[in-house]
Each structure stands twice: as structure tokens, then as C-alpha cells.
């Protein structure tokens, strides 16, 4: 099966959906598919160009098209790239903000229709629309309504043969507007490194004042970690109060660590440091290599997810934590669409409730796992099934 994966940006390490798409293409290639990549709206290139991108031990042909170029020129270049070796499927990895700064993709279907032509289209909806969380502002709800209309219009115009989304809450939102989507939860973007060395981490923690005291065993310290973006609306309460209570009873010190780009959470991090700095130690490690992130996830005790419980299936950061066998706390529960975020609850995921102080001392790591291979197998099985249904029609 020949698949061209279409996304907005393929700058390694700068675009989460692009990184996911590259990994999925590589995994499909390792399972016998012919995979290629197209970035249709890439802000990191100034001119169109082809290159070979490496991921998970595979080399993949990629075409990157600059966001500044006219749509007509980008579509012509992408069509020429595809015509050299016709694909069985185009897989559009859609996130509305990749195409427009406010996520309003009105008219996108008209641009993409000539590219798709008579090829079978798969659509992965990584994001839908905003305004569904409790307490959403009027501005969020209005913008979300525009985004919803644009997504529905896109699907109506392009008529994909197969649609996936990452969590049951999104599937329910789509079902409410008459769109049926299968679930394809995300995998982690960080490969598990066997025998990872954590010497660099211990040195950094000493320099940043977050290491345990020299005479204290590691078992007397709990390390909680954020990975990636910290949304400005994320609240440390009541999580940090629960952690403090559990740590006092268990006679543990607590370190709160962050790795990766923190994004819009700069001010929130400073506020947490000022408010809780007497009770917990804090350390920001910044952007690191995948191998260092893997060693970090293997060296801490608990992950903290910043995605709401019902949307947890769309979080690549949470998926990376779970892939590393890390118990993950999910404090946010401000989205209520009437569906859990995963088809099957993961025993390593802990929804934050008042029992958290009792759960923390009992939590244990799981075994590392390779969710990418299973994801690729499920993806290809689903589109093969959709393709057979399409032929039968």
C-alpha cells in the first residue's frame, strides 16, 4: 500500500503533529507500506524543496512547501510530487491552527480538492474546535463555532473514505454533527532508550537546586514531571495540596520538574515557583534531545498531564509518559462531553480525585512499551477496511 502523509509542517522538533506524522510514516514503512511526506504550509522553509527525513530508523522522502507561497503554486508542486509514483491513499493529518493562526480554515477544501483528485482520502482530526470546556468565554465559543463550520465544510467537500480522531470525546462531538470517526489514540513521540543514562539529569538538578540532599536516598524524594507545553489555564490546585499532604505522610521531599518547551506557561511557572517554592523544589530543563527526554521520563516518579481527562487521548506528551511506564496524573477535568478520553482506561493514568494522596505512595511504574508499531498496524488495517467498503459501493 502506498500512502502519502500530508501535514502542515515538517520541521523536526518544532511541530508536534509533524513529528507524529513522520513517526507514523516511518512505522508504516517498516511494516511494508510505501510512505512519503508532504508539508503543505511549512513556516520553516522559504522555497519549495525535497529532502530525506529520518525517523525511527527509516528514511522517508519529503516535500516541504513554504506557507508564504500562493496556494496554487503549492498544490501544483504537491501534485507533481505525487504523480511520480501514484499513491493508494492520501492521509491528511489535520490541525486547524496549522493552516490559520486562529484555526479558521474556511476555503481549505477548495485548495485541497485539486490535490486529492480521485485518490482515496484518509483524514486524521488532531484538533476539532475550541469553546467546549466548562467556563469557555464568549469569544472562545464564537471562534469555536466558526472552526466547527469550517471543519464540517472541509469534510463535506473532500468526502474522506476514512476518518480518525484521537479520543472518544472528539468522536462524540463529530457524531453530534453527523460525522462518524474511528478512534486512533496517539503514540508517544519519544522512543524508549534502553539503559538510559541519567547522569546529566542529576548534574542539572544539582545546579538548579532541585537535587536531593547528599545523604538522602533517592527513595525519599518524589519527582513529578511536566513534558512540553504548560497551558496558561492549567491550575496547580488542588493537585499540589494533595501532593504536599501525601509527601508529608510518606516523609518524602518533592521536586517539580519540566522538560521541553513550556510555551504559554512562563508566567504560570513563575507563579508556582513563588507560591510553592518553600514546599517543593522546582527545575526547568528546557529543550533536550529525544534520548535525554527518554532518560528523564525513566528517572522521575510521576508524570503530570496538562490535557483534560476527556481529551487525554490526543496528548502526545501523556502518551510518551505512558510509553515509558510512568504513572501519569491527570488534574484537569474541565471538558464534559460525556465520553472518556480513551477506549480502554490505562492503569497508569490517574484521574485526580480526593483519593490521590492515598494513591501516590502505592503507585508503581509499568513496563516500557512500543505503542507506535501497534498504532501503525491499526491505522493501516482501518484504511484497508475503509478502502474495501469504498470499492463495494
Where are each of the predicted segments found?
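N-terminal strand-loop element at the rim of the active site
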Residues: 7-12, 26-84, 170, 261-266
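A short, glycine/small-residue-rich beta-strand->loop->alpha-helix junction that serves as a flexible
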Residues: 7-22, 45, 98-103, 232-236, ...
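Membrane-proximal helix-turn-helix segments that form the acceptor-binding/catalytic region
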Residues: 110-117, 141-162
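Nucleotide-sugar donor phosphate/pyrophosphate-binding loop at the beta->alpha transition
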Residues: 122, 130-154, 169, 190, ...
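A short, active-site helix/loop in glycosyltransferases that binds the activated sugar's phosphate group
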Residues: 132, 152-183, 188-195, 267
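Conserved donor-binding/catalytic core segment of Leloir-type glycosyltransferases
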Residues: 205-235, 257
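Nucleotide-activated donor-binding/catalytic signature segment of Leloir-type glycosyltransferases, i.e.
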Residues: 258-260, 267-291
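Acidic donor-binding loop of glycosyltransferase active sites
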Residues: 297-312
Amino acid at each position: 500500500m502506498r500512502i502519502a502523509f500530508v501535514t502542515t509542517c515538517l520541521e523536526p522538533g518544532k511541530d508536534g503533529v509533524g513529528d507524529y506524522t513522520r513517526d507514523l510514516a516511518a512505522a508504516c514503512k517498516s511494516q511494508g507500506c510505501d510512505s512519503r511526506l508532504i508539508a503543505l504550509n511549512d513556516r520553516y522553509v522559504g522555497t519549495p524543496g525535497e529532502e530525506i527525513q529520518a525517523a525511527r530508523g527509516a528514511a522517508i522522502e519529503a516535500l516541504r512547501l513554504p506557507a508564504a507561497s500562493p496556494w496554487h503554486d503549492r498544490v501544483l508542486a504537491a501534485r507533481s510530487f505525487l504523480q511520480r509514483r501514484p499513491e493508494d491513499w492520501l492521509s491528511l493529518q489535520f490541525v486547524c491552527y496549522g493552516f490559520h493562526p486562529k484555526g479558521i480554515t474556511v476555503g481549505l477544501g477548495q485548495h485541497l480538492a485539486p490535490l486529492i483528485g480521485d485518490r482515496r482520502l484518509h483524514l486524521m482530526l488532531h484538533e476539532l474546535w475550541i469553546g467546549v470546556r466548562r467556563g469557555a468565554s464568549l469569544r472562545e465559543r464564537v471562534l469555536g463555532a466558526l472552526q466547527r463550520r469550517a471543519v464540517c465544510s472541509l469534510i463535506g467537500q473532500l468526502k474522506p473514505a476514512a476518518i480518525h480522531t484521537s479520543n472518544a470525546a472528539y468522536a462524540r462531538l463529530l457524531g453530534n454533527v453527523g460525522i462518524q470517526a474511528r478512534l486512533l489514540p496517539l503514540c508517544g513521540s519519544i522512543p524508549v532508550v534502553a539503559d538510559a543514562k541519567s547522569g546529566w539529569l542529576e548534574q542539572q538538578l544539582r545546579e538548579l537546586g532541585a537535587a536531593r540532599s547528599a545523604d538522602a536516598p533517592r527513595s525519599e524524594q518524589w519527582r513529578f514531571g511536566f513534558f512540553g507545553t504548560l497551558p496558561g489555564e492549567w491550575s496547580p490546585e488542588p493537585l499540589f495540596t494533595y501532593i504536599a499532604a501525601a509527601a508529608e505522610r510518606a516523609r518524602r521531599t518533592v521536586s517539580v520538574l519540566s522538560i521541553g518547551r513550556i510555551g504559554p506557561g512562563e508566567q504560570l511557572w513563575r507563579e508556582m515557583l513563588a507560591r510553592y517554592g518553600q514546599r517543593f523544589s522546582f527545575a526547568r530543563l528546557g529543550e533536550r534531545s529525544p534520548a535525554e527526554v527518554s532518560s528523564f521520563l525513566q528517572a522521575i516518579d510521576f508524570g503530570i498531564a496538562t490535557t483534560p481527562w476527556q481529551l487525554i487521548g490526543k496528548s502526545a506528551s501523556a502518551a510518551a509518559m505512558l510509553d515509558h511506564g510512568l504513572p501519569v496524573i491527570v488534574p484537569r477535568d474541565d471538558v464534559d462531553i460525556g465520553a472518556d478520553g480513551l477506549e480502554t482506561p490505562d492503569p497508569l493514568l490517574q484521574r485526580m480525585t480526593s483519593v490521590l494522596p492515598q494513591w501516590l505512595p502505592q503507585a508503581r511504574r509499568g513496563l516500557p512499551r512500543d505503542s507506535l508499531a501497534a498504532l501503525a498496524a491499526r491505522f493501516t488495517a482501518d484504511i484497508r477496511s475503509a478502502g474495501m467498503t469504498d470499492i463495494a459501493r
